[in-house]
Amino acid sequence: RYLQDYEGWLEKLEQDYTRIPSETKVPTRTYFLIRKSDNKIIGMINIRLALNEKLRKFGGNIGYSIRPTERRKGYNKINLYLGLKICQEYGIKEVLMDCDKYNLGSAKTIQALGGVKTKECYNDEFKETVEFYSIDVDKSLSANKELYEK
């Protein structure tokens, strides 16, 4: 919904940056993944620094996206790795994530970075089955450092 109003989207990001946790909102940081060779925005990652009741149930600490033309090239693994580094800087030890059961690309990305499936349930709001994962941040970063820090 913010694609039509870039300035409004940036304003929302700024509000989320400074927001105190509540039942409906949590402090959030948004980062872009930019390819060095051509300065093209490849993707983004949204990191929620705290979780409220709703985000513990669906959503978790991280949401991400890769430009459709750049999918299936390994960029989201880099995106998630860098996001986990930011989580570590903020003292987040365990990251909770979820994805649609049929989003195999996202599930593979989460699993590649050490995500362990903790449960699966149906989301009535979105009418889909959701898989939930937990990632030990320190363990993931340690295991993947040589692969993603070149």
Predicted regions and their residues:
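Catalytic cores of nucleotide-sugar-dependent glycosyltransferases that transfer UDP/GDP/TDP-activated
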Residues: L33, I92, E120-N123
